[in-house]
Amino acid sequence: MASRRGALIVLEGVDRAGKTTQGLKLVTALCASGHRAELLRFPERSTEIGKLLNSYLEKKTELEDHSVHLLFSANRWEQVPLIKAKLNQGVTLVLDRYAFSGVAFTGAKENFSLDWCKQPDVGLPKPDLILFLQLQLLDAAARGEFGLERYETGTFQKQVLLCFQQLMEEKNLNWKVVDASKSIEEVHKEIRAHSEDAIRNAAQRPLGELWK
């Protein structure tokens, strides 16, 4: 009998919505309750591609928009062997951003269609659950360190949010919207409940492929 696979859970949202905080809390809580769980963050900045992206995000270098979109996708693809291996070992993975951020942030730029933006990520491991942390842009901008990295401007984040809203219309993906303006503990409780459901369901079905 095949061992139960772990769930692939993604945290998405505009910048400073609390994804990293909630990802860490979720992994800690899942491990405390007997699950095997780990956190991965995208971009994964330790690889050669990731270092290039880190320099770009910190505004130290400039890259052409099409090229940088493909690099973000490549950064996800280079983690696919690890993701699949962990899931097959029964480890639940919590991802701080994934392909949806890649599509939304490029789609927010001029002259990019969402269809074009999706293409490089077609076939990535399909998440069992995507948690969108909903936060008013003014509230996000008021949170610490907003504006330090590229893309952290109110005007651009508004366009990003519109792209996310279009992505959430897809019926074959398991999106759950969470009100991130609530207290950290309230948000965590809701995320935890959705995640426990996803873990139970993932154990009964094979891993899918994104946008296929």
UniProtKB/Swiss-Prot annotation:
One of its GO terms (biological process) is thymidine biosynthetic process. Belongs to the thymidylate kinase family. It catalyses: dTMP + ATP = dTDP + ADP. SUPFAM superfamilies: P-loop containing nucleoside triphosphate hydrolases. Keywords: Acetylation, ATP-binding, Kinase, Nucleotide biosynthesis, Nucleotide-binding, Transferase. The modification N-acetylalanine is found at residue 2. Homodimer. Its cofactor is Mg(2+). The keyword Transmembrane does not apply. Gene3D superfamilies: P-loop containing nucleotide triphosphate hydrolases (3.40.50.300). NCBIfam families: DTMP_kinase. ATP binds at residues 16-21, 97, 182, 192. The lineage of its organism: Eukaryota, Metazoa, Chordata, Craniata, Vertebrata. Its EC number is 2.7.4.9. It comes from Mus musculus. One of its GO terms (molecular function) is dTMP kinase activity. It holds the Pfam family Thymidylate_kin. This is Thymidylate kinase. Residues 133-157 are annotated as: LID. Pathway: Pyrimidine metabolism; dTTP biosynthesis. Catalyzes the phosphorylation of thymidine monophosphate (dTMP) to thymidine diphosphate (dTDP), the immediate precursor for the DNA building block dTTP, with ATP as the preferred phosphoryl donor in the presence of Mg(2+).
